[in-house]
């Protein structure tokens, strides 16, 4: 009897010690920073940017190593046009342990693209692809960065073509991970045209068009599809689409005038 009680007492002590080791008390500053972060994120979602910035700045001040606090703080700064401060916070998040966080690199790639710093955007997108190859955003951003780099190198035809083909491969991978993403499909079609692949571009435009109700596709889709038909010398179909473009009052737009010239030139041949 005594032996059983003794063993039971030892078990209780062992469990108690284990629980004590696994439990880490939350400090008052951690509790307050978590509360301020939740308030800041809620304000950010509601578009109350100044309030979000203040709350998230408090959260970061109280818990400097929480990368999610910094990521949301950076977003609040960015949406107010404080771009360099935002980039600083994201960079600080990476330095404080977020170097393997794909979301941080995705956010940086997005922001550097807006600032037209395409090489830096490509570097962060490339890192995001390495860290999380199943996230379509990583591939899309890397493809976008390459496409924009190619557009800046118009004088270097061979290199531009190589970069554009690399961009196409990234877009194809992104679309395979997010097949109904309308923005991605439109960009892929444009890249396919740039790569001299109008047949593939037309297939992409048709896939994109199928995601809308009949006649409900955006002007960009209708014009892109019609331009591609013209390049393929399918002028009867292009002229049929042109009638819809005229009904929408787009014939005098820059794209409309360019398209009208393409169709007219083809019809005269």
Task: Give the role of each language-model region.
Residues 17-70, 79, 88:
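N-terminal leader/linker segments that initiate helical-solenoid repeat arrays
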Residues 30, 64, 98-99, 133, ...:
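Short coil turns that delineate tetratricopeptide repeat
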Residues 38, 72, 107, 141, ...:
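Canonical tetratricopeptide repeat
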Residues 47-55, 80-92, 115-127, 151-173, ...:
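Structural signature of tandem alpha-helical TPR/SEL1-like repeats
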Residues 69, 104, 138, 184, ...:
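TPR alpha-solenoid repeat register
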Residues 211, 216-269:
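Terminal, low-structured helical/coil segments at or just beyond the last alpha-helical repeat
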